[in-house]
């Protein structure tokens, strides 16, 4: 094919300096040609020409012609790097929907979760766990979301600090012992529990968390 003879002719000269003008010239005529777009994207990726705006155009066209989990993910990463967070999340979500491998779905959902905070971060992390129940990153994100909301989730200083018990419990579910210990250290002490008179009682967090924790018995 013409594409193969061009590749052969370029040979070792197929670097960004040569590829970009060549693909720029041929892009318009091939913007709906899946084979050409795939080859061009692959070659530009191999030669590390991915920072050029042409690469984004080629991958976007390829995604429009033949959407795949990989092209959607790639566009998500590129929009991320460009600071277009909302667009990146849109492509990551599309990638999740197109992906058939549950472990990859879970990893993608973690990437989306890390772009959010609080309730949205937890929702995406929980979705990630539904595809891979042993994804410790999901528990890390959830624990962090709870801990970062301590100040807004209790009506007393004791209740606010009790949120750290929930964060620690969540971290432990993911086998994150050192993180759990850090949150435990921020939670009420045994003296605090004794003085509160709440030992063995339930505390419900009436903020976005909407969960309860049982205060440890002394």
Predicted regions and their residues:
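TPR/TPR-like (Sel1-like) alpha-helical repeat modules
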Residues: 1, 126-134, 147, 159-188
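Preference for long, solvent-exposed alpha-helical segments and helix-linker "stalks"
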Residues: 1-54, 65, 177-218
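Alpha-solenoid helical repeat scaffolds
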Residues: 24, 56-60, 93, 126, ...
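Residue-level recognition of tetratricopeptide repeat
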Residues: 33, 68, 102-105, 134-136, ...
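Structural register within alpha-helical repeat arrays
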Residues: 39-44, 75, 108-112, 142, ...
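Short coil/turn linking the two alpha-helices of tandem helical-hairpin repeats
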Residues: 45-49, 81-83, 103, 113-120, ...
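Structural marker of alpha-solenoid helical repeat scaffolds
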Residues: 64-65, 98, 131
């Amino acid at each position: 094919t013409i594409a193969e003879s061009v590749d052969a002719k370029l040979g070792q000269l197929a670097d960004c300096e040569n590829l970009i003008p060549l693909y720029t010239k041929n892009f318009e005529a091939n913007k709906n040609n899946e084979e050409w777009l795939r080859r061009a994207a692959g070659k530009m990726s191999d030669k590390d020409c991915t920072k050029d705006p042409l690469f984004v155009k080629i991958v976007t066209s390829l995604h429009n012609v033949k959407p795949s989990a990989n092209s959607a993910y790639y566009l998500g990463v590129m929009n991320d790097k460009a600071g277009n967070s909302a667009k990146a999340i849109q492509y990551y979500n599309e990638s999740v929907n197109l992906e058939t491998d549950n472990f990859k779905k879970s990893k993608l959902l973690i990437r989306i979760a890390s772009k959010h905070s609080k309730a949205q971060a937890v929702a995406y992390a929980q979705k990630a766990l539904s595809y891979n129940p042993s994804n410790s990153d999901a528990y890390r994100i959830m624990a962090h979301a709870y801990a970062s909301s301590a100040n807004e989730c209790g009506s007393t200083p004791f209740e606010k600090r009790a949120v750290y018990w929930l964060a620690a419990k969540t971290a432990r579910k993911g086998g994150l012992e050192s993180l759990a210990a850090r949150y435990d250290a921020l939670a009420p002490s045994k003296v605090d529990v004794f003085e509160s008179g709440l030992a063995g009682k339930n505390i419900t967090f009436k903020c976005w968390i909407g969960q309860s924790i049982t205060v440890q018995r002394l």
